[in-house]
């Protein structure tokens, strides 16, 4: 974001131009910033180690006091521009995956702990009410070493504020350090909740049981070329984990919003397996629509089970979401990707047939408008439409416009005036359907 430079005599120059453009836009969209304080401005860095195509510097600061001054000025600027009430609703996360030494942090574990403490105290010195935390830890450390335990012990013993704990999780097995397997193992779907529960136990043991837990990176794969990211599989994947972690975490942040992404070079295909909810051309993937359908749920939970959830809103309207999650098969889970190709991406899943649900409602009073939103390989999956188009590598304007129109759930409506109503839902593998019953006046 080019926030820091220096004059010839070493006097700091702070520049918030790009920060303001970004935060102004986010706030205009109703989005609350979750601020990650990384990576290191090059003129503050102790060394020249970098990561990713855009060369983010992973070094600790050469002078901690200069970094702290930058942080204080940044916080003051945010408070002055947006007001204390607004900024108090944000979160400030210190660094990204410092447990991955030599990858995202070019210092020692002890250096990160001290860096975290100094950074948090710099923030709190300006406005104590601001929410600070971290360490945005990778999930491998959760299973393979005591990094999280030692971090929390340090915070407790040194009386360093930890307002929230953050970590990242993906499906790949976090290999032990002594293992040198080439193949990557995919864990079962229960692995996400098991990881959360394991971390919660560690937090309780360290006397941080009441601290908010945030997953600030989450997706199916940590690999930004995993071809499954574009497929219909991702819609029930998102819904399954949103439901399975309900109440266990404060926030679940999908990584990432778009395939316009500068950690690696840009592939030629419009569907190359990028992390994003939206591809580089602005086409919305099934994962995007999964979040959109979740957003339509009400605030009162009525029922939840294997493949379904029902909610209600204050006016008596109801919402029922059904999903058919199918996991990858044992061969793919073991690391064999030989059945996966750019145009053939569904032979790597367990063989499951359609799944049937039945929704029966009684004692309905008044009139309801029932709207169904169907999303599956034949209805609204833009990747599958691209395959049926012939999988062109470079999309013309006409082709792109066509795919935009074919992306998204198929919608049907009907009016319900009877006191009893029954609906059968038949979902193919990876299929999703939302039924909303809106009270009519």
For each feature predicted by the language model, list its residue ranges.
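Acidic (Asp/Glu)-rich catalytic clusters
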Residues: 21-32, 77-86, 152-161, 205-207
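N-terminal substrate-binding region of glycoside hydrolase catalytic domains
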Residues: 1-76, 83, 93, 99, ...
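C-terminal beta-strand-rich structural cap/linker in extracellular carbohydrate-active enzymes
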Residues: 393-441
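Active-site-proximal loop/turn and secondary-structure-junction residues that shape catalytic pockets
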Residues: 39-41, 96-100, 136-140, 171, ...
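Aromatic/acidic polysaccharide-binding cleft in carbohydrate-active enzymes
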Residues: 215, 219-342, 376
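The substrate-binding groove and active-site-proximal loops of carbohydrate-active enzymes
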Residues: 2-16, 53-68, 96-113, 135-142, ...
């Amino acid at each position: 974001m080019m926030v820091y430079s220096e004059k010839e005599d070493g006097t700091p120059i702070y520049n918030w131009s790009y920060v303001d453009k970004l935060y102004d836009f986010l706030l205009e969209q109703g989005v609350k910033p979750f601020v990650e304080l990384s990576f290191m401005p090059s003129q503050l860095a102790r060394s020249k180690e970098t990561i990713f195509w855009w060369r983010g510097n992973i070094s600790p600061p050469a002078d901690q006091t200069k970094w702290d001054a930058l942080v204080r000025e940044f916080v003051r600027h945010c408070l002055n521009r947006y007001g204390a009430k607004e900024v108090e609703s944000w979160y400030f996360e210190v660094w990204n995956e410092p447990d991955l030494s030599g990858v995202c942090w070019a210092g020692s574990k002890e250096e990160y702990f001290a860096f975290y403490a100094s950074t948090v105290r710099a923030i709190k010195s300006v406005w104590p009410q601001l929410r600070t935390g971290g360490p945005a830890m990778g999930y491998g450390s959760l299973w393979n070493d005591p990094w999280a335990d030692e971090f929390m012990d340090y915070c407790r013993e040194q009386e360093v504020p930890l307002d929230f704990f953050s970590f990242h999780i993906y499906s790949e097995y976090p290999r032990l350090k002594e293992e040198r397997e080439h193949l990557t193992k995919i864990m079962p779907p229960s692995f996400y909740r098991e990881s959360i529960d394991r971390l919660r136990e560690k937090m309780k043991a360290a006397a941080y049981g009441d601290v908010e837990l945030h997953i600030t990176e989450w997706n199916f794969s940590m690999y930004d070329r995993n071809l499954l990211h574009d497929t219909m599989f991702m819609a029930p994947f998102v819904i399954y984990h949103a439901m399975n972690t309900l109440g266990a975490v404060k926030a679940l942040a999908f990584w990432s919003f778009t395939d316009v992404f500068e950690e690696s070079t840009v592939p030629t295909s419009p569907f190359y397996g990028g992390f994003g909810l939206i591809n580089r051309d602005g086409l919305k993937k099934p994962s995007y629509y999964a979040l959109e359908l979740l957003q339509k749920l009400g605030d009162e939970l009525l029922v939840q089970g294997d493949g379904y959830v029902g909610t209600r809103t204050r006016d008596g309207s109801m919402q029922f979401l059904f999903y058919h999650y199918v996991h990858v098969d044992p061969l793919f889970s073991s690391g064999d990707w030989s059945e996966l190709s750019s145009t053939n991406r569904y032979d790597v899943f367990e063989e499951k047939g359609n799944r049937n649900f039945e929704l029966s409602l009684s004692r309905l009073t008044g009139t309801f408008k029932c709207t169904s939103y169907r999303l599956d390989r034949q209805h609204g999956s833009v990747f599958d439409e691209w395959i049926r188009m012939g999988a062109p590598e470079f999309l013309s304007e006409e082709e792109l416009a066509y795919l935009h129109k074919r992306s998204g759930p198929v919608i049907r409506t009907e009016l319900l005036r009877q006191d009893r109503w029954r609906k059968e839902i038949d979902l193919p593998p990876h299929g999703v359907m939302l039924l909303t019953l809106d009270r009519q006046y």
